[in-house]
């Protein structure tokens, strides 16, 4: 039998990291067991669902490299089918019409609150006669359709992450609402728990992997599966992603959407790698940098922890920096060129861009760090006080003059790393000047301070862009 997993997001907001991790776990397990990863858009909330959010979800999945199989199923296309199953449940006596008003429900909740009881519907219309139903309808009252839940029943299943889970019918909040706003003898608008069961059955889903906040929904849905004689899938409930305070990560924690992570400069490979370890602890490896394919080979739902997983910026940043360091210079230069273009910076040549990418990548945590790391190679930096103080020393100023004179005398010299070292050594021996003084003086001329990237590699780049002499001359004018 073909194994089939699915992601079923609601397009009511931007693609969130919690949904993205659920997608990742489903995709990884589908790859591991040779199954399919399917996508269903649950867009039946016509007020909050928006096409731009659907587009955002699809783009986010593609960016993360999580390719889905088969055509996308839109839940809104299946409303008539959902209604037909609610009708079946009505006809077999598993569901009924309830005309309780919002005011009556509010009064009931207030009464329960005053008594210290949890909120729970009292199922007051479970046994209405046909005449009573007709009377409510003739008065123009709308109804909801509720699914009967036996309070004495025990629902249990074996969760692939949490083991056996038991739930009592009396703890499910009363009879479950399947649809709302039913006028007359109509069915109304089908709701989540019914639609999910019907659509998962239609898609032949064998494994449902979702967040632990759905555990109570699973108990309710199992009862609907059984009432409709549908085959139960295997359920797995992943831990929540937590903030530093141990609370569920939310929009109040600032960055939560995949768009925001991308715009901040995180690589999709790095974010996927990090998300996989948010709650997953593989027994077969201690490695922390793994590609999606490598993870899928060892991924197992049983290795996912039950406890919530704390989100760590420090860890994500480290993983992202590792991916940047190990990226091919050609690919990295193509990516960071976009940042250069945004700032109006033009690389003298493709080879020059590759060399600069190699030079700065070890100092980068985020892709956007390329802006600050590259800036001194495109714009002349202001000389900082530490640089000014250093060059006020006569030896330092004289050392810089020696380098400038040498470069002017050797007009049109083709400078590479070896030649740069040779120049430093030659001037040092010829004029009895310490190499350290020469190099620090040159660093101030290039970067305006005593710190910066590798000097020799930088000099090669400044020489290729024909800016090394002009920077040294500019340095003399400013001191």
Swiss-Prot record:
UniProt-listed NCBIfam families: gltX_bact
Subunit architecture: Monomer.
Family of the protein in this entry: Belongs to the class-I aminoacyl-tRNA synthetase family. Glutamate--tRNA ligase type 1 subfamily.
GO molecular function, one term: zinc ion binding
Motif residue range(s): 'KMSKS' region: 248-252
Major location (coarse): cytoplasm
Keywords of this entry: Aminoacyl-tRNA synthetase, ATP-binding, Cytoplasm, Ligase, Nucleotide-binding, Protein biosynthesis
Entry's Gene Ontology BP terms: glutamyl-tRNA aminoacylation
Function: Catalyzes the attachment of glutamate to tRNA(Glu) in a two-step reaction: glutamate is first activated by ATP to form Glu-AMP and then transferred to the acceptor end of tRNA(Glu).
Leading EC class: ligase
Protein name, UniProt field: Glutamate--tRNA ligase
Keyword Cytoplasm attributed: yes
Subcellular location: Cytoplasm
GO CC annotations, alphabetized: cytosol
Pfam families: Anticodon_2, tRNA-synt_1c
Catalytic reactions on record: tRNA(Glu) + L-glutamate + ATP = L-glutamyl-tRNA(Glu) + AMP + diphosphate
Entry EC no(s): 6.1.1.17
Residues binding ATP: 251
Alphabetical list of InterPro entries matching this protein: aa-tRNA-synth_I_cd-bd, aa-tRNA-synth_I_codon-bd_sub2, aa-tRNA-synth_I_CS, aa_tRNA-synth_I_cd-bd_sf, Glu-tRNA-ligase_bac/mito, Glu-tRNA-synth_I_codon-bd_sub1, Glu/Gln-tRNA-synth, Glu/Gln-tRNA-synth_Ib_cat-dom
Source organism: Prochlorococcus marinus (strain MIT 9215)
Entries under PANTHER family matching the protein: GLUTAMATE--TRNA LIGASE, GLUTAMATE--TRNA LIGASE, MITOCHONDRIAL-RELATED
Motif annotated as 'HIGH' region, chain positions: 9-19
UniProt keyword Membrane present: no
């Amino acid at each position: 039998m073909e194994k089939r997993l699915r992601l079923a997001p609601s397009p009511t907001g931007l693609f969130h990291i919690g949904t993205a991790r659920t997608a990742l776990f489903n995709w990884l397990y589908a790859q591991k067991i040779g199954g399919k990863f399917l996508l269903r858009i649950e867009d039946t909330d016509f007020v909050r669902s928006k096409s731009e959010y659907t587009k955002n979800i699809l783009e986010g999945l593609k960016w993360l490299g999580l390719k889905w199989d088969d055509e996308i199923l839109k839940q809104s296309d299946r409303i008539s089918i959902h209604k037909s199953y609610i009708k079946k449940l009505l006809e077999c006596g598993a569901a009924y019409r309830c005309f309780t008003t919002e005011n009556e429900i509010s009064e009931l909740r207030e009464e329960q609150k005053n008594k210290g009881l949890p909120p729970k519907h009292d199922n007051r219309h479970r046994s209405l006669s046909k005449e009573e139903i007709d009377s409510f309808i003739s008065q123009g009252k709308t109804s909801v359709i509720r699914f009967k839940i036996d309070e004495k029943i025990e629902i249990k299943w074996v969760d692939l992450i949490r083991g056996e889970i038991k739930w009592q019918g009396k703890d499910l909040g009363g009879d479950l609402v399947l649809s709302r706003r039913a006028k007359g003898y109509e069915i109304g608008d089908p709701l989540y728990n019914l639609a999910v069961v019907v659509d998962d059955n239609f898609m032949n889903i064998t494994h449902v992997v979702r967040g632990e906040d759905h555990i109570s929904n699973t108990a309710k849905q199992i009862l609907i599966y059984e009432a409709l004689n549908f085959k139960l899938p295997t359920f797995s409930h992943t831990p929540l992603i937590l903030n530093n305070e141990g609370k569920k990560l939310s929009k109040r924690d600032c960055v939560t959407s995949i768009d925001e992570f991308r715009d901040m400069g995180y690589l999709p490979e790095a974010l996927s790698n990090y998300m996989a370890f948010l709650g997953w602890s593989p027994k077969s490896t201690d490695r922390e940098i793994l590609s999606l394919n490598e993870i899928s080979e060892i991924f197992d739902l049983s290795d996912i922890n039950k406890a919530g997983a704390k989100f760590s910026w420090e860890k994500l940043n480290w993983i992202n920096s590792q991916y940047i360091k190990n990226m091919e210079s050609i690919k990295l230069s193509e990516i960071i060129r976009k940042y250069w273009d945004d700032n109006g910076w033009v690389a003298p040549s493709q080879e020059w861009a590759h060399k600069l990418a190699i030079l700065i990548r070890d100092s980068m945590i985020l892709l956007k760090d390329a802006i600050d790391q590259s800036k001194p190679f495109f714009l002349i930096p202001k000389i900082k006080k530490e640089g000014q103080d250093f060059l006020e020393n006569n030896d330092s100023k004289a050392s810089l003059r020696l380098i400038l004179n040498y470069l002017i005398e050797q007009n049109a010299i083709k400078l590479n790393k070896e030649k740069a070292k040779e120049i430093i050594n030659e001037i040092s021996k010829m004029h009895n000047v310490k190499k350290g003084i020469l190099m620090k003086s040159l660093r101030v001329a290039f970067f305006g301070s005593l710190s910066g990237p590798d000097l020799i590699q930088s000099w090669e780049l400044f020489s290729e862009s024909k800016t090394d002499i002009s920077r040294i001359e500019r340095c003399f004018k400013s001191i």
